[in-house]
């Protein structure tokens, strides 16, 4: 009986250990499947350049693997599918001439575009293997950051101003992150320093003298970074501003006075020059008229003080006199020159003879005769006894005196 009981107990113990033995046997057997590994899980790409999605797989099978790359979207997009390195089917137009596969299953994307950004999944399967290997890699595509600059309305600000704004600007770059620096160090937490949600704009509220410093900004993204040149912000005290404004006003006033003082003499000089030119023009006109004026006796007081006779020779036989008839004698009622009286013509003149045109001779100096003295005409040459001289000429001098002198055989009286 004891022997039977011992055998039953040993059998029951064996049944209890059987599941554990079975599990142990399963774990020790080799698994038939593909194992995929990748050195990186995140790759940062640059627009226009290439990115390598690198993977490696291992399998007990020696058959060629079937590789499939997909871009995770709401609806997955198949990038490429191949047996080994041989592409199966037709590539999408977006990836044509930009795809290259390697023996280990890696994928090379050329000429990256912003649309290439996303999560890529690779699946590798082999016919003899039971399990399919999978792996995901994240790819980002960005544009490099161009050099930023700090933009301000003015580099000077008055103390206790309500707000002063600085803007960090750059032309190119995706996914930028901004950092503000004061004197080359990151800004400390200050209730007066306000940043916009994207930290691109810095606003200083209630400006103090301690805000007078150098400011710059730094912009970064996954592939590049840039730092602006520092900008000096000058804070003026209010009392200093009044001094600057008053000094500037005085300088401006002195400048205006100096300009006006220099401008007036030049204007006077211009007027003087115009007057001088006018006088020269008048002198030139006087010089042109002087020869004609010298042939006429002077009028006015000089004639009253020094009257003189004007002798005009007339040729009786000249044919010129026929064209120019003698002027009519002045009537008795017609007034003569003031201060003078002319005696009537002597009746010894031949009225029918033609009068020759007057020939003008230069004036000869003559002494002024005494008042009431009678002058006789100079004696004629004996070679022309039969020719009588007569002159009748009207002369206007200065628009005042008209003197008509007749030279006959008899004398001409000039009374004062």
From Swiss-Prot:
Domain of life: Eukaryota
Signal peptide: 1-33
Biased segments, Low complexity type: 383-398
Glycosylated sites: 35, 138, 167, 189
GO BP of this protein: cell adhesion; immune response; protein localization to cell-cell junction; regulation of cell cycle
Complex and partners: Homodimer. Dimer formation occurs predominantly through cis interactions on the cell surface. Part of a complex containing MLC1, TRPV4, AQP4 and ATP1B1. Interacts with CLCN2.
Disorder named in the UniProt entry: Megalencephalic leukoencephalopathy with subcortical cysts 2A: A neurodegenerative disorder characterized by infantile-onset macrocephaly and later onset of motor deterioration, with ataxia and spasticity, seizures, and cognitive decline of variable severity. The brain appears swollen on magnetic resonance imaging with white-matter abnormalities and subcortical cysts, in all stages of the disease.
Protein name: Hepatic and glial cell adhesion molecule
Species name: Homo sapiens
Gene this chain is encoded by: HEPACAM
């Amino acid at each position: 009986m004891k022997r039977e009981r011992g055998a039953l107990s040993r059998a029951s113990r064996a049944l209890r250990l059987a599941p554990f033995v079975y599990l142990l046997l399963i774990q020790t057997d080799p698994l038939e499947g593909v194992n995929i590994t990748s050195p990186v899980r995140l790759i940062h790409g640059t627009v226009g350049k290439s990115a390598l999605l690198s993977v490696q797989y291992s399998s007990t099978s020696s058959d060629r693997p079937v590789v499939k790359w997909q871009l995770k979207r709401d609806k997955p997009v198949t990038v490429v599918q191949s047996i080994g390195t041989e592409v199966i089917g037709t590539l999408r137009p977006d990836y044509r001439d930009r795809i290259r596969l390697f023996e280990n299953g890696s994928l090379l994307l050329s000429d990256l575009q912003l649309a290439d950004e996303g999560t890529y999944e690779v699946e590798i399967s082999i016919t003899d293997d039971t399990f399919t290997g999978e792996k995901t890699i994240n790819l980002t595509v960005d544009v490099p950051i161009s050099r930023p600059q700090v933009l301000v309305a003015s580099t000077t600000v008055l103390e206790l101003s309500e707000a002063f704004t600085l803007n960090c600007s750059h032309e190119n770059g995706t996914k930028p992150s901004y950092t503000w620096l004061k004197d080359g160090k990151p800004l400390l937490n200050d209730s007066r320093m306000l940043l916009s949600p994207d930290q691109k704009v810095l606003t200083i509220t209630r400006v103090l003298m301690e805000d007078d410093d150098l400011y710059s900004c730094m912009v970064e993204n996954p592939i590049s970074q840039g730092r602006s040149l520092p900008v000096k912000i000058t804070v003026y005290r209010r009392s200093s501003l009044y001094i600057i404004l008053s000094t500037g006003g005085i300088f401006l006033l002195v400048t205006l006075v100096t300009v006006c003082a220099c401008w007036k003499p030049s204007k006077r000089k211009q007027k003087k020059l115009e007057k001088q030119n006018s006088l020269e023009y008048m002198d030139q006109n006087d010089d042109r008229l002087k020869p004609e004026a010298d042939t006429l006796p002077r009028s006015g007081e000089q004639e009253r003080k020094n009257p003189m006779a004007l002798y005009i020779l007339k040729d009786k036989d000249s044919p010129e006199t026929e064209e120019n008839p003698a002027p009519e004698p002045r009537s008795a009622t017609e007034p003569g020159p003031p201060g003078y009286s002319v005696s009537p013509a002597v009746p010894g003149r031949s009225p029918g003879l033609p009068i020759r045109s007057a020939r003008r001779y230069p004036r000869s100096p003559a002494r002024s005769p005494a008042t009431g003295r009678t002058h006789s005409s100079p004696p004629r040459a004996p070679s022309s006894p039969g020719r009588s001289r007569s002159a009748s000429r009207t002369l206007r001098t200065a628009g005042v005196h008209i003197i008509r002198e007749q030279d006959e055989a008899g004398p001409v009286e000039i009374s004062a």
